[in-house]
Amino acid sequence: MCYRQETMSGLLDGIPEAVALRCLAHVPLHLHPNLELVSRSWRAAIRSHELFRVRKELRSSEHLLCVCAFDPENIWQVYSPNCDRWLTLPLLPSRIRHLAHFGAVTTAGMLFVLGGGSDAVSPVTGDHDGTFATDQVWSYDFVQRQWTPRASMLVPRAMFACCVLQGKIVVAGGFTTCRKSISGAEMYDPENDVWTSIPDLHQTHNSACSGLVVNGKVHVLHKGLSTVQVLESVKLGWDVKDYGWPQGPMVVVEDVLYVMSHGLVFKQEGDTWKMVASASEFKRRIGMAMTSLSDEVLIVGGVIGPDRLNWDIKPLSDVDALTVGNDRPAWRSVAPMTRCRGTILGCTQLTI
């Protein structure tokens, strides 16, 4: 207590510390590095968890988008819609070159990067790096602005489902080090830095899987399959459902499921799907991410593949947004990524 008073005292002359913190809580995250230069006490305040607790209390938290692309390797950028600009995080200090096929989620105000393997190729032999799947876990603390290694997963995995359920991270399925598909699942408690086993998936498939949370339940989807494996609670385990969902990238916006299929964006309404917008302009994109930020669907990065007239592959830094809450949703361009471009390897929303 004495240390905090000493380092954060005198934030604003003549104003109590608690009031000064409430003033600082309204300053956007992208301006924090500038505020740190004012004084030691301001730096201590900006890098305190107390400030972010006050931000949450005052409902001044920001919704940000965290993105990692193939180029440059192991670099994450963060997009702020409030100022329409991108910030670059410090390099992920993983020993693995070109980390890919990992899981990425946010919880407890931090970004977590889990598992995955190397997508690096030797320029001499053309061979891939030997690391296919790892158990490593990293977290990025936006208060301290640093990466920290966390407790390793119980099983190395890549191309797996990764979600947050009630503040805890759930990973399931994917492939392990011998490139064998696995049904195992586990849960991570970020507060205690502990992994525990949870019931296995009922089915394994020789394809990559992904996960999303719909109506408070984890849904694991395997590419090319109509069946979905659903987890509502660890005690109940997994259920296998066949919802007949359209094939294509999916995202949840304000508890509503959206899917991009056959050049169109559809919205789930009960047992039916309503078309909300055309997405034909994205048909040629490969490796893009479809994600959500506040009340918008975002299309991020990717590459334009070769065609009959042009054999070049063009990596993109473009970002397009669709405000689905409007009566007439329309696409608009937002600030492109300033460092990242090409195939999107990780993409997740952060509230802080």
Swiss-Prot record:
It comes from the Eukaryota. The keyword Transport does not apply. GO terms for biological process: protein ubiquitination. Kelch repeats lie at residues 57-109, 110-167, 168-215, 243-293, 296-351. Residues 9-55 form the F-box domain. Pfam families: F-box, Kelch_1. Pathway: Protein modification; protein ubiquitination. Keywords: Kelch repeat, Repeat, Ubl conjugation pathway. CDD domains: F-box_AtAFR-like (cd22152). The keyword Cell inner membrane does not apply. Component of SCF(ASK-cullin-F-box) E3 ubiquitin ligase complexes, which may mediate the ubiquitination and subsequent proteasomal degradation of target proteins. The F-box is necessary for the interaction with ASK proteins. Part of a SCF (ASK-cullin-F-box) protein ligase complex. Interacts with SKP1A/ASK1. This is F-box/kelch-repeat protein SKIP30. It comes from Arabidopsis thaliana (Mouse-ear cress). The gene is SKIP30.
